Amino acid sequence: MAETLNPRAGIGMTSARTRGRMVERLREQGIKDEMVLAAMGMVPRHLYVDQALESRAYEDTALPIGFGQTISNPYIVARMAELARHGENGKGQTLGRVLEIGLGCGYQAAVLGKLAREVVSIERIAALVGKTRARLRELRVNNVKPKHGDGMNGARDFAPFDAIVLAAAFAEVPQALLAQLADGGRLVMPLGNATQTLCLIERQGEAFVEQRLEGVKFVPLLPGVA
């Protein structure tokens, strides 16, 4: 498997058994989609965090990844992936092309890559794009395309998308992203500033149906590039 490429992969506490315990915890927390649970079990989270934080990789907590950014906790990654595939109560959808806003360390993109044919991921911080691109290449994650750019603009050249997942919060839904959703597609994002709510928007022709779900806490979505 891909993790054998990295000398950090053989450490006992970062083994497949540890990921299995994480998956069982996700199941207990209410994640039902077996494909999402399988994806979470396959992606080695400890290889997406700094070595100093490796011992905490499978805790259900967000961790810093540098540049003022964080890797989301496993539950929220699984929850957003499940919403991207199902909506709140729907049947699981096979995903073709997915847009992620906020590449970060690449972990969520790698999970989405297990569920979709292709993932395009936008990151505003150039140094983070370079670091994560190298990591994904090392781990042979070949269907994730990291792009440096302003996430507010999405990725028009690759649209339409079956799902759009935002890994950062914004006060309102970026209209440019809604325009890039395929008919029947879903946008999942943390909505708000100080108080944030996980928001699901489904496109039905020219209409958009919005649901506001549980409270969450994400770093803010910033415009421009760095």
Swiss-Prot record:
A cellular component term, taken from the record's GO annotations: cytoplasm
One of the GO BP terms on file: protein repair
Keywords of this entry: Cytoplasm, Methyltransferase, S-adenosyl-L-methionine, Transferase
Family: Belongs to the methyltransferase superfamily. L-isoaspartyl/D-aspartyl protein methyltransferase family.
Catalytic class of the enzyme: transferase
EC number: 2.1.1.77
Role summary: Catalyzes the methyl esterification of L-isoaspartyl residues in peptides and proteins that result from spontaneous decomposition of normal L-aspartyl and L-asparaginyl residues. It plays a role in the repair and/or degradation of damaged proteins.
Catalytic activity: [protein]-L-isoaspartate + S-adenosyl-L-methionine = [protein]-L-isoaspartate alpha-methyl ester + S-adenosyl-L-homocysteine
Protein's UniProt name: Protein-L-isoaspartate O-methyltransferase
Entries under InterPro entries matching the protein: PCMT (IPR000682), SAM-dependent_MTases_sf (IPR029063)
Record-linked CDD domains: AdoMet_MTases (cd02440)
Active site location: 72
Compartments, record wording: Cytoplasm
Gene behind this protein: pcm
